[in-house]
Amino acid sequence: MMNLVLQYGLYILILVVLAIPLGNYIGKIMNGEKVFLSKILTPCENFIYKMLHIDKDEDMSWKKYSFSVLAFSIISLIVLFLIHIFQGFLPLNPEKVSGTSWDLAFNNAVSFVTNTNWQGYSGESSLSYFTQMMGLTVQNFVSAAVGISVLFALIRGFIRVKQKGIGNFWMDITRTVLYILIPLSIVVSLALVSQGVVQNFKQYETVSLLEPITLEDGTVVTEEVVPLGPAASQIAIKQLGTNGGGFMGTNSAHPIENPTVLSNLFEMISLLLIPVALCFTFGRNIKDRRQGIAIFIAMGIMLVVAMGIIGVNEQMGTPQMALNGQVDLSTINQAGGNMEGKEARFGIATSSTWATFTTAASNGSVNSMHDSYTPIGGMIPMLLMQLGEVVFGGVGCGLYGMIGFAILAVFMAGLMVGRTPEYLGKKIEPFEMKMAVLVCLATPIAILIGSGIASILPETVNSLNNSGAHGFSEVLYAYTSAGGNNGSAFAGFAANTPFINISIGLSMLFARFVPMMGTLAIAGSMVKKKKVAESVGTLPTHNAMFIGLLIFVVLLIGALSFFPALALGPIAEFFQMLG
């Protein structure tokens, strides 16, 4: 148990130490200030603007900014869909992989354009190097940049006074990719290659096993095919951009994607680095660092509590394991805990931490099988996604989602004291409240409607590997992952079917773009308003009371929306295990 506590403390410490300077750096990028990379990258930036005829002086209204986001995303979706369909005719396909089905192409295109990276396939057997590089990796960069750009627009809405424009989308996305995502990805890629993660264009290699394996049917296996490819470059941005889609089917549990404890540390820190840094960017750029720290603390408290619950439940295992003597918490030499579905080289503490990080952020990469966790250990990752991916969340979208909850919190506080609510010096009026509700409720709507329909269809029910409460949890987790733009899975049922591909694709689109449009509408409304001077009745939004209120509002909406569904799934399974 002490190992658990020490690892948790180390991960959080490293994150904060790296995130604070990165947050300041990102703040400079948002404002167009010079940074240490400016001499190298400014000529590249200006060349891109010139080549694409981008007007650097244009300041977009929220409607034009929204139109640009949607137009860019639609074009990205169409291009990625066509790459999947025609990959058999495209270069860099040494394994001669044919094109995917239209429904899988639609699902995967939506998945990567929305920064979800839900995968109903194994990358090493279904996709060519070209599709992985020019399709998925490109979207890993730009979908992350879209989320950060929308956050930039929202911050400008609060800091600008009596204006109409919230920034230039084309400049925001260009600067985000060029100055933030590419430099960080180069560093992480090189670190991963140093640990043995593959980065090449070779054909898959067939190697002889050290020891033959005899299968159940008597077949003796003496060789194994080792998948290769440009993995390190994709893995770096899949973590940094909170994308999560694995180069291999088993994601970061695969020894080629994540071979060592050190590579695991690099990938895990990369996972939450930018979402944590953006909290400090927020405080810096609104010129009140206390606001960013308050949101960071609120998110951090929920993250640490979730880490503790998952870690303890996995270390304690199930009642059945305790009866068999597999778990003994009374001695310093921990006997095991629930190691099912976990890599022996990582163990319970590291696997539990990753499960917390990946579902707190809208990442979805895994280094263990969440379906094999204990009922409560598996419920907490599900709940983190159901809260709206606001416990740090995805790059950009996590913070603007939490700001939506902050608006709800100050509105509730305003009702209690009979004052017009204010946030960051701007009045919160009916329009902002409507948009904030839209931002906060889009995820529950997408999850509950999708999982409800899927759970009553014979096609889905008949494909479940597990019946009862756990089978329902597998379906609920799938649509929770889609609605939370996460991408991880319990698996356990046939996911690559036309209905699942289309329904999950629609859930991902709804949960991505409805909150995004609501956020931009809030930015467009706020940017026109004047600042209101603080008074005795103004609710401070940087103290302990507000942090507690914000956590309460997030948990209240999550609990009210999902408790009935969780009661039918993981909670019911927990009580079944108690016997």
From Swiss-Prot:
Instruction: Spell out where the chain crosses the membrane.
Output: 2-22, 66-86, 135-155, 177-197, 262-282, 292-312, 391-411, 437-457, 490-510, 546-566
Q: What is its main location?
A: membrane
One Gene Ontology cellular component annotation?
plasma membrane
Q: How does it sit in the membrane?
A: Multi-pass membrane protein
The UniProt keywords, alphabetically, are: Cell membrane, Ion transport, Membrane, Potassium, Potassium transport, Transmembrane, Transmembrane helix, Transport
What is the top-level taxon of the source organism?
Bacteria
Report the locations given in the UniProt record.
Answer: Cell membrane
Matches recorded under InterPro entries? KdpA
| Gene Ontology molecular functions | P-type potassium transmembrane transporter activity; potassium ion binding
The record's listing under Pfam families reads: KdpA
Give disulfide pairs as residue numbers: none
Instruction: Indicate the quaternary assembly.
Output: The system is composed of three essential subunits: KdpA, KdpB and KdpC.
Its family? Belongs to the KdpA family.
In UniProt terms, what function does this protein have? Part of the high-affinity ATP-driven potassium transport (or Kdp) system, which catalyzes the hydrolysis of ATP coupled with the electrogenic transport of potassium into the cytoplasm. This subunit binds the extracellular potassium ions and delivers the ions to the membrane domain of KdpB through an intramembrane tunnel.
Tell me the protein's name. Potassium-transporting ATPase potassium-binding subunit
- Which species expresses this protein natively? Clostridium botulinum (strain Alaska E43 / Type E3)
